[in-house]
């Protein structure tokens, strides 16, 4: 079975009508994965052509941030019509309030959180029962009763801690974070500089509202790295540079 990324590559070579016809022939979860792996503009074109019910079922399966990106690319009337047919939009609606190129527009609201008074044993049981998305499992976020971000705990530290120790004892309170209104490039710079796989996003009063994963910003991070390389060579990113040209 082809990986969704490979399926996306195969579909992207087809005319738009064929793409629109092919996607619904896949299982819903598979089609949602393929749509996530397509170029954003291409995914938007397909989404604009799919039947409302089909698109709604795919968006229900997708990560909230990916679903929000597609909805923002649709004209408002179609986006509202699709959302009416979705099973739930609770995790998607907050993301639609932010510009696509900001932290709020890039983040996912599905965040594994722990309350500071939890014991390690209680926290592990809670995670086992809630089954949060594995995409966000690099770190768990510790909050107070008002959901204000206090610290982070690595899954390894949690598992190896004494069962009776409280989460606030083993958490790291020195947390790199970004504001919901920060530009995506600033977030990419933070993640690249500190070698982060996840970046917690907070609002103006330090409440945890979401998290950005490396995958969410990989293209932005790569673009930043390319710009740095060109800057070192005193070239613009639009320069016509042929690295294989002979030295005169």
Segment roles from a protein language model:
Residues 1-235:
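Hydrophobic packing positions in regular secondary-structure scaffolds
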Residues 236-248:
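Cytosolic juxtamembrane amphipathic/interface segments immediately preceding
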